[in-house]
């Protein structure tokens, strides 16, 4: 249970102090000084306990006690010390020597506690409002960034799809087999040896689509322009080597057609027929020296004008006409 309070003893007075009791206490302390509170009631004759004498001196009678309202600095000190020390009012009063612990406790319970509660409520509301505004701004920012990211993602996906389609198209174009841009349909004349074969031998050349290649593949018509182009291309691309006999025979027949533009229609049919006859190839094999000499002359010439000069040379012209007349007779028979 602990020891009983000293005020409960028999003959000990309780209640408020009288002015006479205050004068006796102050006179004794001025003579002997504060301290040894247990001997004060015995030496002074006061019917008070030692604790009551100490509190009366400390809280009311000692010199330097400040009365009246608390300043702002004192309020801040009390709030700070109460937060650190709690309700230890005597320890708090030691930091404020002009204020008593009883005055500090009473002021705390009547004023500062309510004021602190209001301050905390206002701070909480301000913090909550700030957090709400911050959350709202963050949510708006996140929404905006999400929308922008979605839009940028959509643009990126469309760009990626376009790049993929372009890459696939380029790959297909690269892997596809080149198709001739100028499809040419032609028919080779009948190589029969009947009497009507020479009269029914025709060459049909049909060219569709636009002519983008200056030297299109296919069979040329018997014209001087096409023959000149073929010979010019042959001079640029063909290396200086011996030409195979079939190619030489074909070139020989083409030069014959170009050198005799004034021949009759019947002669033209015979020449066209000789282009595709095997007799011309056989005769070319029988005359390799002459053909090689002509082809080498064709290759060594530097321009088309020199070739034309050689083409219309009288001796070469007579030789080619004689050969072609022999070939025409063999085809007819």
Curated annotation (Swiss-Prot):
Q: Please verify whether the record's keywords include Phosphoprotein.
A: no
Which SMART domains did the record assign? SANT
Q: Residues annotated as DNA-binding region? A: 37-61, 89-112
UniProt cross-references to InterPro entries, sorted A to Z: Homeodomain-like_sf (IPR009057), Myb_dom (IPR017930), Myb_TF_plants (IPR015495), SANT/Myb (IPR001005)
Domain HTH myb-type: residue ranges: 9-65, 66-116
Annotated Gene3D superfamilies: Homeodomain-like
Pfam families the record matches: Myb_DNA-binding
Return the Low complexity bias intervals: 196-209
Factors inducing expression: Induced by salt stress, osmotic shock and abscisic acid (ABA).
GO MF term set? DNA-binding transcription factor activity; sequence-specific DNA binding; transcription cis-regulatory region binding
Q: Where is the composition biased (Polar residues)?
A: 134-154
Q: Where in the cell is it found?
A: Nucleus
What does the tissue specificity note say?
A: Expressed in germinating seeds, rosette and cauline leaves, flower buds, open flowers, stems and developing siliques.
Keywords recorded for this protein, A-Z:
Activator, DNA-binding, Nucleus, Repeat, Stress response, Transcription, Transcription regulation
Any additional notes?
Plants overexpressing MYB94 exhibit deposition of epicuticuar wax crystals on leaf surface.
- Official protein name in the record: Transcription factor MYB94
Q: Which gene encodes it?
A: MYB94
């Amino acid at each position: 249970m602990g020891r009983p309070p000293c005020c409960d003893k028999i003959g000990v007075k309780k209640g408020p102090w009288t002015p006479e009791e205050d004068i006796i206490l102050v006179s004794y302390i001025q003579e002997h000084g504060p301290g040894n509170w247990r001997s004060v009631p015995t030496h002074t004759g006061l019917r008070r306990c030692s604790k009551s004498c100490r509190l009366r001196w400390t809280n009311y009678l000692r010199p330097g006690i400040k009365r009246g309202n608390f300043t702002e600095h004192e309020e801040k000190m009390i709030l700070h010390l109460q937060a650190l020390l709690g309700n230890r009012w005597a320890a708090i009063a030691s930091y404020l020597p002009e204020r008593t612990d009883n005055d500090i406790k009473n002021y705390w319970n009547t004023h500062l506690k309510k004021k602190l509660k209001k301050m905390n409520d206002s701070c909480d509301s301000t913090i909550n409002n700030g957090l709400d505004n911050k959350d709202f701004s963050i949510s708006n920012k996140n929404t905006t960034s999400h929308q922008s990211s979605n839009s940028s993602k959509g643009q990126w996906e469309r760009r990626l799809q376009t790049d993929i389609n372009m890459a696939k198209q380029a790959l297909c174009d690269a892997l596809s087999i080149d198709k001739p841009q100028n499809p040419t349909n032609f028919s080779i004349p009948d190589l029969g040896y009947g009497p009507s074969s020479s009269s029914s031998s025709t060459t049909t050349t049909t060219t569709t689509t636009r002519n983008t290649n200056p030297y299109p593949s296919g069979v040329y018509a018997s014209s001087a322009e096409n023959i000149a182009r073929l010979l010019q291309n042959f001079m640029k691309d063909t290396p200086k080597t011996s030409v195979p006999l079939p190619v030489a025979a074909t070139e020989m027949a083409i030069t014959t057609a170009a050198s005799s533009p004034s021949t009759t229609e019947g002669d033209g049919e015979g020449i066209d027929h000789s282009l595709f006859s095997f007799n011309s190839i056989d005769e070319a094999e029988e005359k390799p020296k002459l053909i090689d000499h002509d082809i080498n002359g064709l290759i060594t010439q530097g321009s088309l004008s020199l070739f034309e000069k050689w083409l219309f040379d009288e001796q070469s012209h007579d030789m080619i006409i004689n050969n072609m007349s022999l070939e025409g007779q063999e085809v007819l028979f």
